């Protein structure tokens, strides 16, 4: 049972990493459709203050809100942060935010 859980988690991580793309890459479907966009054109509009309040409403730059893989990665990060043994002992070792006064190494 323990090994099957490890196998499933490993498989899920491999699939997630293989589906992940760097932020600069476009989707393969966009390339196949012939949509030729200049890179940085939308960002230049927002930097220049043009296009009357353009906020990047296409969902691509909305912090991953429309990206299901980003949601999965955020969930995995929250779980690993919750069970991280170093965070559990943070108050004991003196890494807390109480003015730098910790119990052991503060």
From Swiss-Prot:
Task: Write down the species.
Answer: Glossina morsitans morsitans
Give the superkingdom in one word.
Eukaryota
Q: What is this protein called?
A: Glycine/glutamate-rich protein sgp1
Q: What is its main location?
A: secreted
Q: Name one GO cellular component term.
A: extracellular region
| Annotated region (Disordered), positions in chain | 20-66
Basic and acidic residues: compositionally biased ranges = 22-45
Keywords (alphabetical) are: Secreted, Signal
Presence of the UniProt keyword Transcription in the record: no
Q: Where in the cell is it found?
A: Secreted
Biased region (Gly residues) positions are 50-66
| Annotated signal peptide | 1-20
